[in-house]
């Protein structure tokens, strides 16, 4: 009997992209195009949050002129810390807080990881010149100063990681407190300093922490830094969200498609009195409800009814009997802008009095103005009918030719029927006399010319003249 007589097929494990660590997922998404990020962001909530962070990283960090290595290193480590508890990512996302934007603000405020290139070049050249005369004294001074800067950045890096770890612990306790339906007092553990959410230590600035605290070894479980800051999610003060491009660039990823994660949003009918009452309360439930109401109020879109476009679409061919044509010439009152007082020019009044003597100056009467507009519409209709008729086209072409011929002889252009002017023809008689005869255009050419002679003038001159 062979060893491989029976082969048992083991079921394949489910493999998903979300099973990878967060820092590795962030690096993978950083190599994708914008269209691919949008498609991945529509799959689940976790990938949508990472795609949003990647967009902020491209816009704020990569597009900036400062050094970005410090922000990038801290960001990768923060994602590594959040990988153990991904519920904290959803908490940050529910409050529209961006990790990349927050780290970038800290880096800009305290100028972490920024080295002035001009200053570095000048100091290097000075050391190169003076080292030949005075040895390497300047070089030693530079070497003594460099560890100070590196230590300061390392302390900031470690403090941020421990603050994130502290936030994860508070987030877990908040979830457990809400699920157990207990009051705001937490279960006491090894850290006897923290008894409740509002029993945290007093707020201190980052520079004071760097001065007061000696160098310490980072601890993965507990941290004294950043317990309660003004920007913290569970702070007793009013929430302060990031005024960054975070709310603008997440327009494509606002809709979550993860069925397991449901965002709790309060109703829009809550009054401002309840918000004031929740601000004065010290309970964890009231604080969480207050944050949800404030975020819902800030991020709630305005519900406005879509109004129909008042602009009318022009059809390919308009006629006098078409309803669209009437709307263009005389639009209805609901489309026209509402004006409290209408100013009418003096020239317009004189023109109305000249065309309509019985108008009696009733310019403020809307019925009179409407009557004038209806008369104009009738004139436009007749003009369009006349221009579109086939007989009128031939008449207008003939009139144009006649006007062109008369323009060389007479500067006056008459609007009425052109006058057929009589022409005289010079005729030489047998006695070498010149006489003028009138030529009628309407008569046939074969008729007797002697019957149409009106006037005969004797020149009494020779033919040679």
Curated annotation (Swiss-Prot):
This is Mitochondrial F-box protein MFB1. SUPFAM superfamilies: F-box domain. Gene3D superfamilies: 1.20.1280.50. Keywords: Mitochondrion. GO terms for cellular component: mitochondrion; SCF ubiquitin ligase complex. It comes from Saccharomyces cerevisiae (strain ATCC 204508 / S288c). Residues 254-263 have a biased composition (Basic and acidic residues). Residues 253-279 are annotated as: Disordered. Pfam families: F-box-like.
């Amino acid at each position: 009997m062979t060893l491989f007589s029976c082969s048992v097929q083991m079921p394949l494990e489910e493999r998903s992209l979300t099973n990878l660590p967060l820092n590795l997922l962030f690096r993978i998404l950083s190599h994708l195009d914008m269209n691919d990020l949008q498609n991945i962001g529509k799959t689940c909530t976790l990938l949508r949050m990472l795609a949003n962070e990647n967009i902020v990283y491209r816009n704020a960090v990569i597009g900036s002129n400062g050094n970005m290595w410090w922000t990038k290193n801290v960001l990768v480590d923060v994602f590594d810390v959040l990988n153990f508890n991904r519920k904290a990512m959803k908490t940050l996302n529910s409050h529209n807080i961006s990790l990349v934007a927050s780290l970038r603000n800290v880096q800009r405020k305290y100028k972490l990881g920024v080295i002035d290139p001009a200053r570095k070049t000048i100091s290097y050249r000075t050391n190169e010149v003076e080292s030949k005369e005075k040895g390497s004294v300047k070089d030693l001074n530079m070497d003594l100063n460099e560890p100070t800067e590196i230590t300061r950045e390392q302390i900031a890096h470690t403090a941020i990681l421990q603050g994130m770890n502290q936030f994860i612990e508070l987030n877990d306790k908040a979830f457990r407190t809400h699920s157990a339906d207990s009051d705001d007092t937490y279960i006491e553990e090894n850290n006897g300093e923290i008894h409740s959410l509002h029993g945290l230590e007093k707020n201190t600035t980052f520079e004071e922490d760097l001065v007061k605290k000696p160098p310490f070894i980072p601890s993965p479980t507990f941290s004294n830094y950043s317990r309660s800051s003004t920007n913290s999610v569970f702070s007793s003060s009013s929430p302060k969200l990031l005024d960054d491009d975070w709310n603008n660039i997440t327009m494509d990823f606002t809709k979550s498609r993860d069925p397991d994660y449901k965002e709790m949003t309060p109703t829009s009918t809550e009054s401002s009195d309840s918000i004031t009452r929740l601000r004065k309360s010290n309970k964890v439930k009231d604080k969480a409800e207050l944050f949800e109401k404030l975020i819902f109020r800030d991020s709630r879109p305005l519900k406005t009814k879509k109004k129909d476009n008042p602009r009318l679409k022009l059809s390919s061919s308009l006629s006098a009997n078409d309803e669209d044509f009437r709307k263009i010439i005389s639009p209805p009152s609901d489309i026209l802008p509402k004006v409290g007082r209408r100013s009418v020019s003096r020239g317009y009044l004189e023109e109305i009095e000249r065309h309509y003597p019985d108008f009696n100056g009733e310019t403020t009467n809307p019925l009179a103005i409407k009557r004038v507009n209806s008369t104009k519409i009738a004139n436009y209709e007749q003009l369009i009918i006349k221009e579109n008729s086939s007989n009128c086209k031939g008449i207008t072409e003939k009139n144009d030719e006649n006007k062109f011929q008369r323009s060389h002889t007479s500067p006056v252009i008459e609007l009425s029927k052109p006058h057929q002017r009589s022409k005289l023809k010079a005729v030489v008689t047998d006695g070498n006399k010149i006489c003028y005869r009138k030529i009628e255009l309407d008569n046939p050419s074969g008729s007797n010319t002697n019957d149409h002679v009106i006037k005969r003038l004797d020149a009494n001159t020779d033919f040679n003249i």
